[in-house]
C-alpha cells in the first residue's frame, strides 16, 4: 500500500563499514588479477595458473608423453584438467620419455617452438621499430623547423628531394650568414648617445634613412670609434645641409675642470669663525641667532633681547618685556588677533604671573 515503510536489511549498524569496504576492494582486486592471468584460449578452470604453463602446453600440437611406472602412455590435455603438465615436467631423452614409438614428434615439436619464438620476437621488433607517418604541413614551415631544430629531424626517413634540400640549405646558410652580419653591424651602433639639442635638418634627414633606429624627434650621436659613414651621417633629404654629429666623449682635462672644487683646510678654519649664512637670504644678512649683526632683516623684526642676569632670572617681574615687539614668537603682531596679543604696552608693567597669556585668563577661563 502507498505510504508503507518497508525495512530492507542491507547493512547492520553494528557492522564496521571500513571492514566491509576493505573486503569488497580486496575481492574486486583478486577478480581483476585472475582475469588478467587467464589466457584467451584457456578454459575457466585453468584461470589461476600462470600463462607460461598454458602457453607451453597448447603450443605442443597433438598428444604428449610423460614417464609413469615404466609405461609410456599418451594423455590428451583436453580430456583432463591439465595438472600433469604443470606438476610434472617433460623428462629429457635419457629417461625414455621420447622413445621409438613417437620419435618423429621431437623435431616437429622443436620446429614449432622455434617458429613460435621467431614470430613472437618478430612481432616485438615490428612494434618497437614502427615508424609513424610524419605530420603533413607546409613545406616552408617544415624547412624552417629543420633549420631551427635539426635534432628533431635526426631520425627522419624522408629522403625525397635531397638535392633540392641541400641546395636550399646552402642558400639559407648564406642568407643566415648575411643576416648575422647585418645584425652584428646594427648592434655595433646600438649604444648611441642622446642629444636633446637636435637640429631640424638632421632630424628631417634621419626620418628618411633606412637605419632601424629612426626617430622623428631625437638625434643619435655615434661613438668616436665609428670611422665609417653610416645611414645617420650620410643620409639627406631635399639636399638639406646638416652638421656632422660630434662625439660625446670629453677629454680628461675638461672632466677635471668640470669637477666642483672642494674646500681646503684653510678655508674650513676660516669658515668656523665666520657667522653662518643662509642661501636664500642676501649676502649682507645672516641668521638671527648671530650676535654680531645689528642690521634688521625686515621692518617688523627687531634685534633679539639679551638674556637677563642670573639675579634677574629668579624674578621675571624685573625682566623687561615688550609685548608689541615682534621678537616674541608667540605674541607678535603678525599672528592672529586673539586676546592679549593686542593689549596695551602699559600692561607690560604687570608681573608675569598676573598677566593673561593668549586667550586664557589667569584662572584658565577664556578671555573675552
From Swiss-Prot:
Residues covered by region (Disordered): 156-213, 228-259, 291-319
Signal peptide (residue range): none
Biased composition (Low complexity): 156-182, 195-213, 228-240
Family matches, as Pfam families: DUF5349
Domain of life: Eukaryota
Ranges of biased composition (kind: Polar residues): 183-194, 241-254, 297-311
Designated name of the protein: Uncharacterized protein YBL081W
Organism name: Saccharomyces cerevisiae (strain ATCC 204508 / S288c) (Baker's yeast)
Amino acid at each position: 500500500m502507498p505510504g508503507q515503510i518497508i525495512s530492507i536489511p542491507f547493512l547492520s549498524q553494528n557492522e564496521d563499514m571500513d571492514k566491509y569496504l576493505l573486503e569488497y576492494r580486496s575481492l574486486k582486486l583478486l577478480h581483476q588479477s585472475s582475469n588478467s592471468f587467464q589466457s584467451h584460449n584457456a578454459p575457466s578452470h585453468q584461470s589461476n595458473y600462470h600463462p607460461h604453463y598454458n602457453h607451453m602446453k597448447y603450443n605442443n600440437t597433438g598428444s604428449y608423453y610423460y614417464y609413469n611406472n615404466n609405461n609410456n602412455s599418451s594423455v590428451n590435455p583436453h580430456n583432463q584438467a591439465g595438472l600433469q603438465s604443470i606438476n610434472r615436467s617433460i623428462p629429457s631423452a635419457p629417461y625414455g620419455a621420447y622413445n621409438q614409438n613417437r620419435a618423429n614428434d621431437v623435431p616437429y615439436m622443436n620446429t614449432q617452438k622455434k617458429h613460435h619464438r621467431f614470430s613472437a620476437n618478430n612481432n616485438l621488433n615490428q612494434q618497437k621499430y614502427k615508424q609513424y607517418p610524419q605530420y603533413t604541413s607546409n613545406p616552408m614551415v617544415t624547412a624552417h623547423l629543420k633549420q631551427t631544430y635539426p635534432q628533431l629531424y635526426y631520425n627522419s626517413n624522408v629522403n625525397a628531394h635531397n638535392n633540392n634540400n641541400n641546395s636550399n640549405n646552402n642558400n639559407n646558410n648564406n642568407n643566415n650568414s648575411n643576416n648575422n652580419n647585418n645584425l652584428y653591424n646594427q648592434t655595433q651602433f646600438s649604444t648611441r648617445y642622446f642629444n636633446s639639442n637636435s637640429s631640424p635638418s638632421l632630424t628631417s634627414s634621419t626620418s628618411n634613412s633606412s637605419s632601424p633606429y629612426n626617430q622623428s624627434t631625437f638625434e643619435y650621436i655615434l661613438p668616436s670609434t665609428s670611422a665609417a659613414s653610416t645611414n645617420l651621417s650620410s643620409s639627406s633629404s631635399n639636399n638639406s645641409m646638416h652638421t656632422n654629429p660630434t662625439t660625446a666623449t670629453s677629454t680628461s682635462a675638461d672632466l677635471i675642470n668640470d669637477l666642483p672644487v672642494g674646500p681646503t683646510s684653510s678655508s674650513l678654519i676660516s669658515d668656523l669663525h665666520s657667522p653662518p649664512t643662509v642661501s636664500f637670504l642676501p649676502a649682507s644678512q645672516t641668521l638671527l641667532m648671530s650676535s654680531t649683526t645689528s642690521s634688521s632683516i625686515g621692518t617688523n623684526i627687531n634685534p633679539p633681547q639679551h638674556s637677563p642676569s642670573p639675579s634677574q632670572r629668579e624674578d621675571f617681574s624685573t625682566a623687561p618685556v615688550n609685548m608689541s615687539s615682534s621678537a616674541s614668537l608667540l605674541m607678535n603682531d603678525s599672528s592672529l588677533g586673539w586676546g592679549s596679543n593686542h593689549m596695551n604696552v602699559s600692561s607690560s608693567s604687570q608681573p608675569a604671573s598676573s598677566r593673561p597669556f593668549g586667550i586664557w585668563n589667569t584662572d584658565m577661563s577664556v578671555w573675552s
